Amino acid sequence: MKDLFKFFKTHSNGKIEEFNTIKIQLASPDMIRSWSFGEVKKPETINYRTFKPERDGLFCSRIFGPIKDYECLCGKYKRLKHRGVVCEKCGVEVTQSKVRRERMGHIELASPTAHIWFLKSLPSRIGLLLDMPLRDIERVLYFESYVVVEGGMTSLECRQILTEEEYLDALEEFGDEFEAKMGAEAIQILLKNMDLKNECECLRAFLEDSHSETKRKKVSKRIKLIESFILSNNKPEWMILNVLPVLPPDLRPLVPLDGGRFATSDLNDLYRRVINRNNRLKRLLDLSAPEIIVRNEKRMLQEAVDALLDNGRRGRAITGANKRPLKSLADMIKGKQGRFRQNLLGKRVDYSGRSVITVGPYLKLHQCGLPKKMALELFKPFIYGQLELKGLASTIKAAKKMVDREESVVWDILEDVIKEHPVMLNRAPTLHRLGIQAFEPILIEGKAIQLHPLVCAAYNADFDGDQMAVHVPLTLEAQLEARALMMSTNNILSPANGEPIIVPSQDVVLGLYYMTRDRINSKGEGMVLSNPKEAERLYRLGIAELHARVKVRITEYKLDNHGRWVDKINFVNSTIGRAIFWMIVPKGLSFDLVNKVLGKKSISMMLNHCYRVLGLQSTVMFADQIMYTGFTYAARSGASVGIDDMIIPTKKVDIIDAAESEVAEIQEQFQTGLVTAGERYNKVIDIWASANERVSKAMMDNLATETVINSHGLLETQASFNNIFMMADSGARGSAAQIRQLAGMRGLMAKPDGSIIETPITANFREGLNVLQYFISTHGARKGLADTALKTANSGYLTRRLVDVAQDLVITQDDCNTFAGIVMSAIIEGGDVKESLRERVLGRVLAEDILKSSNDSDVSNSEVLIKRNILLDEFYCDILDEYLIDVVKVRSVVTCDTDFGVCAKCYGRDLARGKLVNKGEAIGVIAAQSIGEPGTQLTMRTFHIGGAASRVASESSIQIKNQGIVRLKNVKAVINGQGKLVITSRHAELKIVDQFDRAKESYKIPYGSIVMKKDGELAVSGEIVAYWDPHTMPVIAEVSGFVKFIDMVDGQSVIHQTDDLTGLTSIVVLDTSERVSSAKDLRPTLKIIDVNGYDIFIPGTDISAQYFLPGKSVIQLVDGSRIISGDVLARLPHETSGTKDITGGLPRVADLFEARRPKEAAILAEISGVISFGKETKGKRRLMICSTDENGGENIYEEMIPKWRHLNVFEGEYVERGDVISDGPESPHDILRLRGVHAVTNYIVNEVQEVYRLQGVKINDKHIEVIIRQMLRKAIVIRSGDSDFLAGEQVEYARIKIVNQTLEREGKVKVSFVRNLLGITKASLATESFISAASFQETTRVLTESSVAGKKDDLRGLKENVIVGRLIPAGTGYAYHQKRILKRYSESYSDSKLKENLIETIPVTADEASANLTELLNAT
């Protein structure tokens, strides 16, 4: 590795040395000596009297360089003319003092010591290499036992551990035929004597023969380690140190404090200990002291070196005078305060300031108000330059004086300097890229920065004391970027979902809402006006009110095909306010957009529409006008909240009385024993929840409307002008739920443990709470605050992990020409469309042509509607809607074929700009920010099922909402005695479609449901189409016949029970655990036979109709009774699934991205086949799936399943691979393994979206797909074919793809592999770049691993380039990196031409060649 110091040394011609990769490897003792400028022999630092460094000490000037610039220590040589002279008296070279920051020293250790990282960082590299347990190695290192280093002709094995006694015995027995040592030197000899190549070949041979999975794993780990040593030219013995480098003194300074004391870096203490112990050891060795003393000293030296490298990794940490552990070298680089995160990834910058923000309602969108004082300080260099240029100051010093005195001319120049010079405003926490935007500054008096109200949403800022930072871009390029890319006017759309983020809120919304409302019998109603100007005049003169219904002549403009404005004049029924508002609407929008009551949603839609139709400039000007108008009319409206606005409904008393009497009734039933305690509790809570709903409905109905007599003398209802209602209805502030607490009832509250208290708060805030009610409600309030604090930290950590996993994903090419993609359709759950197809595919690129007639039998001649590779924008989405297309295959990031990066077509639209994404866009970071930014809005809690939530869990029927045709999917069913369908399949679905076969609703139907409609029948809205018993799972007879009981021995395998209430007798099957031992093998079964006693076969199969009954089944038949297909043979009661917690909110998102296996995950079928159950063990059942292949050979898969798992399948049932056998949350790893990449993508996308949708947050699917691509970037090699990979090795998927292409060209055997899903933390640490991984987490482990393997970092990602201080290979830095790569290739190309002429070219491995090729392709 090039020394870090020479890294940025400039050449003689002043150019910075170019480097393309950074390599990390072990340092050999010779290399450490070559870095060093001399040996540190004494532990002294500086002389306490003269304050000069001691010679040969830790701060020695002779080794490290002078303290003052160009001045030796004794003062003989001073000043520049003696540059380079070495003083003969004090031995100091005369040079700059900054060399003390880069010159290193070294310590020659008297005895070798092990490097603690390679010993203790798990898995221990030394242990793995020597194949010895860590305990044994530690005992050797810390002088507790001997290790045999040379066995000779004796019976002792090499690397055998001997205790003191065993060693003495062996000495007596064999004399000096063997050699055993202790301490690091023994380990060093063992490492030195290793023949790596030979060892590797032996292990590979062993790997071929071995069949034990664990041994193979261990051996392949060793092979990887040994190979990495061979490839990287590292010698194993370098893991043991003979020479210790000493850090340059200015990086571990000794600072004099006042009062004669010194503040020092902890490293100096640690070094002192090492030097002291080392010198003592040298002396003891010279004196040939007794072995036991020397040993003790060697052990202490080993401990001192351990503490210096990584304090606290082994044993207790060494503490300083103040009892806190000393900060070692390892602590310097890891953690939030370490080198990586504190100094390399986040630096403080010059030319910045911060201040409180206030509102600037008169600013334009691209402006911000900057206090004069601040501007003067920030723009100083520019002002100095201008003062000199204009000849007002002769020198910079004079200019500085003028500015300090704040002369009047300075202010004029400041105005000049600031003109068109953007500044950047940033509000912490910067959760997404809109947290920093550029504005043009306007100088203002005062000391607070003024911010435009419309950008508050992007910054998440409010004016309750928030502070913001200002940064000044200095260079011309920086100013250009700030203006072109970061100006607030260029960031109208949110990168997360493509909707406008410059949206009015609060006052502005209220103003516009008030302005566009209509009121019956307003002054001036029924007037006819010639134009909007007249409307404004009448309003100003007080002739007409704002809400008066009038007729106005409106002129609308539309662009024709030649780009000319065409006007269209209409008479429209409207109001005065809307006519006035029309005056600010830009040309090209229709009056329909304005001619309605404008709430927050409709204003947002209007701006979005304006952006798509008229472009950026009009939208920005319109947004500003909307804001000014909104503020004006909000002030005019005089809307404010008074206590009389909270109107309590009169029905409230009755509703609460009714609820109380219902509760009393349930209480009585409980006391007579009719209901259990749990049922009583649930019912009480349900009663109160519905009472609360009724009260709030009564309250809202009361608030929302009022009835008035109109001009015709008739009653008419209109929306009320109640202030609180207007604020909620417009979306300005507040919501129905909050109004309910003000004027309805507060409702049910939770206890600290999350359970719901069954007595609700019946009062509201207007009536006031009594003491008990207040006490109950304090808990919730407190929990809310605690939650918020937790949430912020957790959300921040999630964002950090997401950014880290996705940071190197950049758009690198235009089109990868893949035909792959994912199939998208609308998401329908139950009766409502959660997300329409239009919303999902907008801004995506088609992967396949869309044909006009999708249901036409002859596809070949049907016309192409939209070609593949077309970006679906609003226009094409309208076509999709028009032709009723409901399934579209679109390109996706997950299926993109680009090797390192993604192509623009697979990504689709850049949401923040509204057109196809550009090359160099850092889509990974944008995706991470889009998912992480709303993280703070998610909840932290896990939901306990119980009370109100339990009603949802026990639905028992399907009631449809829209009229339509019933379609049944995946249905196996039998027809019962009443002619109804009884479902006997597991994954049945019921859809309601319209006459064009578009799905409107979709429901899952459980096994045993009775369906009232047949496929293709019409159902009307509100009709119940299917029902089932929610509390039991039935066993359904698939044929008619007579029941025959098998193995049902009373008292052994079954018992009879009689119900007290009904007097009916039923048979209950005993669980195997409850049976006597003799009955364990009985398998209670119901068989269906015909009149003659023969088996009946299930139609269409050769399986006889017999049903094995699981434990706890209840049978209400008698042996031999007649049954009809579709009858219920037995019922299995659902165990009341206690309170299973549903993880929701932020923890759920984190679990999904970390790909955690859920507790009690669903069990899926590993292969397709027929289910059977084998012999049971104590706590488990043996599930067998038997499949037949084409040749008729049987293939059996076995799995042991815990008994308490509730199985969804019966014996003899056929399952498909990936089908659910036992319910539970599905594990994404299983989905990937059994159903493939598309299924796991769909699963994660839908589950994550589910959480965000609950909070009303919109995020585009493609962001989640970007993260999933990164989670899937590794694959596991199964068979290595003709490649260099090892079986079981985890390799980048892109690497395998490249190697396979090469192998295919050469006609060799390809690598077979499976995709591997890694959680985001694992995936970040498994990245190819060690710099990126080390700066993320587990720094020690990453660096240890990389240095042993001699890893190279190609600086491909963003993070690595930030750390080495370069432009990032994304955005405007993308071109710079492309140039560098091309230059590098042209240079290496010309070099290789030279070499070709001289000698045959060096053979390149297929890997390297293909990697270079793809890199070149990506680059060009």
UniProtKB/Swiss-Prot annotation:
Cofactors that this protein relies on: Mg(2+); Zn(2+)
GO annotation terms (biological process): DNA-templated transcription
UniProt xrefs under Pfam families: RNA_pol_Rpb1_1, RNA_pol_Rpb1_2, RNA_pol_Rpb1_3, RNA_pol_Rpb1_4, RNA_pol_Rpb1_5
Reactions it catalyzes: RNA(n) + a ribonucleoside 5'-triphosphate = RNA(n+1) + diphosphate
GO molecular function: DNA binding; DNA-directed RNA polymerase activity; magnesium ion binding; zinc ion binding
Keywords: DNA-directed RNA polymerase, Magnesium, Metal-binding, Nucleotidyltransferase, Transcription, Transferase, Zinc
Residues involved in Zn(2+) 2 binding: C816, C896, C903, C906
GO cellular component: DNA-directed RNA polymerase complex
EC number: 2.7.7.6
Co-factor: note: Binds 1 Mg(2+) ion per subunit. Binds 2 Zn(2+) ions per subunit.
Gene3D superfamilies xrefs: 1.10.132.30, 1.10.150.390, 1.10.1790.20, 1.10.40.90, 2.40.40.20, 2.40.50.100, RNA polymerase II, clamp domain, RNA polymerase Rpb1, domain 3
Residues at which Zn(2+) 1 binds: C72, C74, C87, C90
Domain of life: Bacteria
Chain sites annotated for binding Mg(2+): D462, D464, D466
Enzyme class, UniProt record, top EC level: transferase
Function comment: DNA-dependent RNA polymerase catalyzes the transcription of DNA into RNA using the four ribonucleoside triphosphates as substrates.
Family stated for the protein in its record: Belongs to the RNA polymerase beta' chain family.
PANTHER family given in the database record: DNA-DIRECTED RNA POLYMERASE, DNA-DIRECTED RNA POLYMERASE SUBUNIT BETA
Subunit comment: The RNAP catalytic core consists of 2 alpha, 1 beta, 1 beta' and 1 omega subunit. When a sigma factor is associated with the core the holoenzyme is formed, which can initiate transcription.
Entry protein name: DNA-directed RNA polymerase subunit beta'
Gene that encodes it: rpoC
